[in-house]
Amino acid sequence: MARIAGINIPPHQHTEIGLTAIYGIGRTRARKICEACGIAYSKKVKELTDADLEKIRDQIAQFTIEGDLRRETTMNIKRLMDIGCYRGFRHRRGLPMRGQRTRTNARTRKGPRKGAAALKK
């Protein structure tokens, strides 16, 4: 089993799909990494040699991924909340921040409905 950036890459998947198991790497970035390393996207992860894996690790080291990316995202949201801007306010309240309506819909962001009895109290 290939281990890249502290993540076990599923061996039965194609390289392009397997790399998406790493947080911060999607299909497009995975494809570009494969191109830069000279590896076919359709090659299975278990078929990769140690040299191929090392090339992939070197390419991935150039990007912000996993814990660093999660930390950066969290800090960006925290900064928005600290400066008191509209987006930070919406994050704090758990509401959509990109102008969507909230009178109806927005259930994903607001959570499950509260019954009429809960609202009267």
Curated annotation (Swiss-Prot):
Gene3D superfamilies: 1.10.8.50, 30s ribosomal protein s13, domain 2. Keywords: Ribonucleoprotein, Ribosomal protein, RNA-binding, rRNA-binding, tRNA-binding. One of its GO terms (molecular function) is structural constituent of ribosome. Residues 93-121 are annotated as: Disordered. GO terms for cellular component: cytosol; small ribosomal subunit. Part of the 30S ribosomal subunit. Forms a loose heterodimer with protein S19. Forms two bridges to the 50S subunit in the 70S ribosome. PANTHER family: 30S RIBOSOMAL PROTEIN S13/40S RIBOSOMAL PROTEIN S18, SMALL RIBOSOMAL SUBUNIT PROTEIN US13M. Belongs to the universal ribosomal protein uS13 family. Located at the top of the head of the 30S subunit, it contacts several helices of the 16S rRNA. In the 70S ribosome it contacts the 23S rRNA (bridge B1a) and protein L5 of the 50S subunit (bridge B1b), connecting the 2 subunits; these bridges are implicated in subunit movement. Contacts the tRNAs in the A and P-sites. This is Small ribosomal subunit protein uS13. It comes from Acidovorax ebreus (strain TPSY) (Diaphorobacter sp. (strain TPSY)). The lineage of its organism: Bacteria, Pseudomonadati, Pseudomonadota, Betaproteobacteria, Burkholderiales.
